[in-house]
């Protein structure tokens, strides 16, 4: 008999390091890759793996995410085990703390244990909703069952110099976790390669009994916060539970011959920008065109993209770029960029190495370079963005260490 698997996506993250993109939306609802939202990748991973019973746990500025899920991710009403349901924080009342919002990743699940009980799950897959990657969850579940683990953690080998931002595991020869350290300044390396650390991707598969026991035993005394990395996983190891690491690099994706190596946290503006730029190469490391692993999202019913004018010096053209429907390139040039829906670029404008969200208008003779422009921005003719960073800062734009300029949503020039 096929096991009952419940998917839970943690989508309440504030994403403060992604400001100003997260000033009016949560991190999982930030647009990505022309037509998607960041959360779409977690949902697609579940659906492409045959997990169709999904709760999305939301909290911070969830309106944009709520509208996206309700508009684009709906099943019919006749299949009770096929659902994608939003679960907002509801001020759970603790005896010691009173009514509180979600106080961390584990607390979000703890406050909704009744959903797991009502579904009668055998296994619970708890995944982060704010990373860019493909993952065959079914294969991870198979390994979880084969190893007879209580909890399996998706693991990503990463250079030690970068691993301090993540939870880090030490494992034995069979990849059973022997130690878990959450965001330590000097993370340990792998025995076979000291320059690499085994980091947690924030994705877990729990056997239901172990999840219920661990949440109830590890919450005691956690008044400031309650997280899987800080509290639950260390408690599981201390109490002798079988905690297994799952090698993400061995995760098979249908239709993909090369190893599955791509996973991005996109927790900063620079990381987010680079992940978008990863899509535009001839043979991108992260391929969104694999028909055996479709990436679905909300349909907007936009008309096709259009390129007009071809006289000398005034050609509507684009090179090495990705763009959604409704785009009109009217005598402008676009290079190495990712464009959202319903963008209008007027004659003689030059857009280079940019990420433009939906409903942006670029005036004549404007020049945009290494910029992220949020939704509903009308750029006047002759405007330069990303060319003079001092002037960009004077206008209140964010300029990152690498020189990426961010124009906030609905900015008025």
From Swiss-Prot:
Transmembrane stretches, start-end: none
Documented EC number(s): 2.7.7.27
GO biological process: glycogen biosynthetic process
Molecular functions (GO terms): ATP binding; glucose-1-phosphate adenylyltransferase activity
Keywords from the UniProt entry: ATP-binding, Carbohydrate metabolism, Glycogen biosynthesis, Glycogen metabolism, Nucleotide-binding, Nucleotidyltransferase, Transferase
UniProt pathway: Glycan biosynthesis; glycogen biosynthesis
Superkingdom, taxonomy of origin: Bacteria
Reaction(s) the record says it catalyses: alpha-D-glucose 1-phosphate + ATP + H(+) = ADP-alpha-D-glucose + diphosphate
One Pfam family hit: NTP_transferase
Matches recorded under InterPro entries: ADP-Glc_PPase (IPR011831), ADP_Glu_pyroP_CS (IPR005836), GlgC_bac (IPR023049), GlmU/GlgC-like_hexapep (IPR056818), NTP_transferase_dom (IPR005835), Nucleotide-diphossugar_trans (IPR029044), Trimer_LpxA-like_sf (IPR011004)
SUPFAM superfamilies xrefs: Nucleotide-diphospho-sugar transferases, Trimeric LpxA-like enzymes
Keyword Nucleotide-binding in annotation: yes
Residues that, per the record, bind alpha-D-glucose 1-phosphate: 102, 167, 182-183, 200
Subunit structure: Homotetramer.
Function noted in UniProt: Involved in the biosynthesis of ADP-glucose, a building block required for the elongation reactions to produce glycogen. Catalyzes the reaction between ATP and alpha-D-glucose 1-phosphate (G1P) to produce pyrophosphate and ADP-Glc.
UniProt record similarity statement: Belongs to the bacterial/plant glucose-1-phosphate adenylyltransferase family.
Name of the protein in question: Glucose-1-phosphate adenylyltransferase
Gene that encodes the chain: glgC
């Amino acid at each position: 008999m096929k096991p009952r698997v419940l998917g839970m996506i943690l989508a309440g993250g504030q994403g403060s390091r992604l400001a100003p993109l997260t000033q009016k939306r949560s991190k999982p609802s930030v647009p990505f890759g022309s037509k998607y939202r960041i959360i779409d990748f977690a949902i697609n991973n579940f659906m492409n793996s045959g997990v169709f019973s999904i709760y999305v746990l939301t909290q911070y500025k969830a309106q944009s995410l709520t509208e996206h899920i309700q508009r684009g991710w709906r099943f019919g009403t006749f299949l009770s085990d096929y659902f994608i349901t939003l679960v907002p924080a509801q001020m759970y009342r603790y005896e010691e703390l009173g009514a509180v919002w979600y106080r961390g990743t584990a607390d979000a699940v703890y406050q909704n244990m009744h959903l797991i009980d009502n579904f009668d799950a055998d296994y619970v897959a708890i995944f982060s909703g704010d990373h860019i990657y493909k993952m065959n969850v079914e294969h991870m579940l198979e390994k979880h069952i084969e190893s007879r683990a209580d909890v399996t953690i998706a693991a990503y080998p990463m250079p030690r110099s970068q691993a301090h931002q993540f939870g880090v595991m030490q494992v034995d020869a069979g990849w059973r976790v022997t130690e878990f350290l959450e965001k330590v300044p000097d993370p340990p390396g792998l025995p076979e390669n000291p320059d690499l650390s085994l980091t947690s991707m924030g994705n877990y598969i729990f056997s239901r009994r172990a999840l219920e026991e661990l949440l109830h035993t590890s919450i005691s005394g956690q008044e400031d916060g309650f997280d899987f990395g800080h509290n639950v996983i260390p408690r599981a190891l201390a109490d002798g539970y079988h905690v297994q690491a799952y090698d993400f690099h061995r995760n098979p994706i249908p239709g993909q011959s090369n190893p599955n190596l791509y996973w991005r946290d996109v927790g900063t503006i620079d990381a987010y920008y680079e992940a978008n730029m990863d899509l535009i190469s001839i043979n991108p490391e992260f391929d969104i065109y694999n028909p055996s692993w479709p990436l679905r999202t909300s349909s907007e019913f936009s008309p096709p993209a259009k390129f007009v004018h071809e006289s000398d010096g005034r050609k509507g053209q684009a090179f090495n770029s990705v763009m959604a429907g409704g785009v009109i390139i009217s005598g402008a040039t676009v290079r190495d960029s990712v464009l959202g829906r319903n963008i209008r670029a007027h004659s003689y404008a030059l857009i280079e190495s940019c990420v433009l969200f939906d409903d942006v208008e670029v005036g004549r003779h404007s020049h945009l370079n290494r910029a992220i422009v949020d939704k509903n921005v009308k750029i006047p003719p002759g405007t330069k963005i990303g060319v003079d960073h001092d002037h960009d800062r004077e206008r209140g734009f964010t300029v990152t260490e690498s020189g990426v300029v961010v124009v906030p949503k609905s900015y008025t020039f």
